[in-house]
Amino acid sequence: MCFGLEKGSLMGEQRPFYEEDNWVKISLAIPFKYNPGTHFVYNNVGPYLAGILVQRRFGCDLVSYLTPRLFSKLGIKRPTWETAPLNSFGAGGLFLTLSELHKFGLFYLNKGK
């Protein structure tokens, strides 16, 4: 969130108005205004691009990648993840039931154990 952008990008209210389906292209075209680490602006670009890296590296969407590594181990049977044009939206949009969210929260509180 501190990598130099002037304003939030890929935010929920903005996404329906993008004319370009390639959100990686949109994200990489955003100019940097500040030096990285010097200015905080909440945005979805960094987490979105991190999700893209996982998807490209392993050749599958985020749910397919994380199910055997995380979700099934936590007993989360059918997670749903919001999609963007062309891929999963790694910056947000993970839909879990309340009990699944509880399991995830306990996993986090127990530092991955």
Where do the protein language model's features map onto the residues?
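Active-site-adjacent helix/loop patches that line small-molecule binding or acyl-intermediate pockets
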Residues: 1-76, 98-102, 106-112
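A beta-strand-loop signature enriched in Asp, Gly, Thr, and Trp
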Residues: 81-89, 111-113
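Carbohydrate-binding/catalytic loop surfaces
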Residues: 86-99
